From Swiss-Prot:
Binding site for Mg(2+) 1: 22, 45
One GO CC term, this protein: cytosol
Name under which the protein is recorded: Translation initiation factor 2 subunit gamma
Lineage of producing organism: Archaea, Methanobacteriati, Methanobacteriota, Methanomada group, Methanococci
Domain tr-type G: 6-203
Enzyme Commission no: 3.6.5.3
Pfam families named in the record: eIF2_C, GTP_EFTU
Entry keywords, A to Z: GTP-binding, Hydrolase, Initiation factor, Magnesium, Metal-binding, Nucleotide-binding, Protein biosynthesis, Zinc
Length: 410
């Protein structure tokens, strides 16, 4: 069970650009996740956005009207019981930002695939995001047919049939399809009921050695701060197993790149947890579920501008090795998704450059050897990962990285 104030489950908000992921997140949480200046200017998500909400239920009203995220019942104004606190991970839908979406997928216990009723289905990144969820093992999926306020009933039914056809044979074949207008808040009660039913809180073993996927890192100090007021660097991410508490020593891998002569190696960073927080509230300890901010004693220069994102953190001496080369068992898709021409995917080749996502890290590697059942890849940036972890594999096709499958680390 998550600590009070902590979310129990992470739900990804995925889908094609401009289909309404960020608007739906805002309607459910009250938080507009596009806060980066470039995002506001361009009107699209660029980084992963995070926001929490509590699903509540009125004990006197019938289903689904009894479900809300408000402070009182939308139907009768009565008192509410809190059922569960959840975290949304809002992933970018633009094709150039696929690496960011893939790094977010590793944090997701379930996902909401947002599809606009006002456009033909599937759009390129609708396909690519669904394949990514499949490749990275995210199975609990809901489909939101958004923007139903913009189409006629006939067009909405036709779009629904397109969605059913598109998801046939995929991990989302039996996913509920919920028509919603995020703009008007229509049918959100039905969506909340479906989240409760179809995206359960995973069973967590808090006795395992803790591991935290680092998705963001920051310098929280304002320019011109007095030296006595300076705070250590902050990392943000999700605990995937075990528990961390204030005062614990924390090791972060791969760490810092050190060059001696003409040789380069990576040195893990060891620090101390000064604070744990979620949504502006302090915690004494944190367990899996939701997105956690970890205050440390690190020089903020090491954490600024997401410098440590993609790292793995845990207790000193418990983390897996840092890999500079990786041996994987590849599982490739049949065709390239996300592009207009759905080309047949050829097997991996020796000396091919690939983009790999494992956990929250994104790296590029060159295949040293490639067979159908085994590939060895030399990494440009090392990763800290365990045997058995899933790796998303992307190949450069034209000017874009395209998801071509996944691999299991051997």
């Amino acid at each position: 069970m998550a600590a009070s104030n902590q979310s129990e489950v992470n739900i990804g908000m995925v889908g094609h650009v401009d289909h309404g992921k960020t608007s739906l997140t805002r309607k459910l949480t009250g938080v507009w996740t596009d806060t980066h200046s470039e995002e506001l200017k361009r009107g699209i998500s660029i980084r992963l956005g995070y926001a929490d909400c509590e699903i509540k239920k009125c004990e006197t009203c019938d289903e689904p009207e009894c479900y809300t995220v408000g402070k009182k019942c939308d139907s009768c104004g009565g008192k509410l019981v809190t059922l569960r606190k959840i975290s949304f991970v809002d992933a970018p839908g633009h094709e150039t930002l696929m690496a960011t979406m893939l790094s977010g997928a590793s944090l997701m216990d379930g996902a909401i695939l947002v599809i606009a009723a006002s456009e033909e289905c599937p759009q390129p990144q609708t396909k690519e995001h669904l394949m990514a969820l499949d490749a990275l093992g995210v199975e609990n999926i809901l489909i939101v047919q958004n923007k139903i306020d913009l189409v006629t009933e006939e067009a909405a039914i036709e779009n629904y049939n397109q969605i059913k056809e598109f998801t046939k044979g995929t991990v989302a074949e039996n996913a509920p399809i919920i028509p919603v207008s995020a703009h008007h808040g229509a049918n959100l009660d039905v969506l909340l009921k479906a989240i409760q039913e179809f995206i359960p809180t995973p069973e967590r073993d808090e006795t395992l050695t803790p591991k935290l996927y680092v998705a963001r890192s920051f310098d929280v100090n304002k320019p011109g701060s007095e030296i006595k007021d300076l705070k250590g660097g902050v990392i943000g991410g999700s605990i995937i197993q075990g528990a961390l508490k204030v005062g614990d020593e924390l090791e972060i891998k791969p760490g810092i790149k050190v060059t001696e002569g003409n040789k380069t190696h990576w040195v893990p960073i060891v620090t101390k947890i000064i604070s744990l927080g979620v949504g502006g509230k302090k915690l004494k300890s944190a367990v899996p579920g939701g997105l956690i901010g970890v205050g440390t004693e690190l020089d903020p220069n090491l954490t600024k501008s997401d410098a440590l994102s993609g790292s793995l953190a845990g207790l000193p001496g418990t983390l897996p090795e840092t890999l500079e080369k990786m041996v994987i068992k590849p599982q490739l898709l049949e065709r390239v998704v996300g592009s207009q021409d759905e080309l047949v995917i050829e097997p991996l080749k020796t000396n091919e450059v690939l983009m790999l996502n494992v956990g929250t890290s994104t790296t590029v590697g060159v295949t040293a050897s490639a067979r159908a059942d085994k590939a060895e890849i030399k990494l440009k940036l090392p990763v800290c990962a365990d045997k058995g972890d899933r790796v998303a594999i992307s190949r450069k096709i034209g000017s874009r990285w395209r998801l071509i499958g996944y691999g299991i680390i051997l």
